Amino acid sequence: MSLAAPFPYFGGKRRAAPIIWRALGDPGGYVEPFAGSAAVLLNRPAHKGRRVETINDADGWLVNAWRAIKLNPAEVAKHAAGPVTEIDYHARLAWLQDRRGPELVSWLEGDPEAHDAKAAGWW
């Protein structure tokens, strides 16, 4: 089953996903070191049996977005809904940039359920 990525991502591998899965076959485990929009994983063919899937990314806000989508999708959708004025957009971007860094990653690493749905929607 193929799922659409919930957001566009520069450098995404959506178009390459079928080629990648033909090359990989049907592994029981899959680790994505640079998840981005997770287009490859979301386009994984149906798999029978046990499987382990892991996505990673160095961008703390991206990790927060995936965690918030998993744990609190309705709240993320609420904050992602528009319309947004240009001033709001720039204010949100500045807010996110001011909070990006080692502290964000430490917060996410310190609690497997830590997430900020508002930031995920804004991101």
Could you tell me what each predicted segment is?
Residues 42, 47-123:
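Class I S-adenosyl-L-methionine-dependent methyltransferase module
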